[in-house]
Amino acid sequence: MRKWVTRALAALFCACVLFLCGMTFVPNLREFGYAVFRRYANYLPSNATVFDNISARISAFEDSLGNVFYKKEAFQQLNASLQYAIGKQMLYFGDSTMVKLRGGQLYELRQDEVLSETVYDLVELNAYCESQGIPMVFVYAHTSLYGDSQALLPVGALDYNNETADKALAILREGGVDVLDSREFLRDYPLEDIIYYTDFHWTVPAAREAAEQVGAWLNANGVPADESVLAEDMYEKRVEENIFFGRLGQRIGTKNIAPEDFALLIPEFSSYIKVTHREGEEEEVREGAFEEAVMRVDEAMRRNDEGYSANCYYAYGPHAWESEYENASAPDSRVLVLKDSYGTPVAAFLSNAVGGLLATDQRKTTLSAEDYVAQYQPDAVVVVYCQDMLREKNYAFMDE
């Protein structure tokens, strides 16, 4: 009897595995193909060997699998609920550990200080820009831990966020790169004003402050920018209550943390901007006032059937391969912004202050940063990245 029970359970297990594989792979064959045959190049180190090539394809496949696994969020939420039920303060999700900070914000621990060669690529890019007479600044978007780490983290949590940031920025500064550190320019803001409870991004007000800092840096380096349109008092703050449920919140579900308020900043000055978003061969052109051309409030703030939106952070535009802004009423300066998702709203705000701005996501594009500098011929280069971009070699940055 026991033998038949064992066989039945084994058969049921195999059937479940086959079902999950089928529901994961069949709808996403194109995604896996793109990862293995195209996106893998973003994982290749310098002077890649055959084995590096194979490893890069495996990494691209694994990342895609993790993103599209069938009912991934449901499994994660069940896992989180079970861990909370037995009193755990640190939630384990295989390759990451999540905690709640003392203020209630969700945060993924950074458990090592390993940097990628991207940090040194930035130093090389800065040297190239200097050789072309183009000033460059690196804007560091810190993740969550502003202030005393030990005062924010639960007892027993081990984290190397600040140590890794210090290590990376020291290399950049020693290499001659100008650095704007958000831990410095956001120091006086309350934590709840600059980080979300359910998401890892910085808030819209934090992004505006970063843009204002860049505007001041541009003028200090001889690149005209209208700093007045970046000031806090030039924007109306609109708060939508209990609407935003970010990526971290989705991992543990609304039973474990509630959707949060989301603040938008709307210009109180007149503007007319043309923006062209490019995603591969696709192109979208919008023009008009900032709120109409750049912002996408209706789409981003639309609540789903569960009563929240997971897309609020897209209110200032998509994380496109390229977003080119043209503003005839601003000073005639051209700025190249190399960014991750933290930099999307920064570039959007900055488009009010300069005549031309090209924002690129180097994780997606096939052109290197040097290519963009050569083609766009900017007056200044601004790099806006969070720490994760300095930890992982996941985009093309410099020509070899």
Q: Where do the PLM segments sit?
A:
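Extracellular glycan-modifying ectodomains
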Residues: 1-400
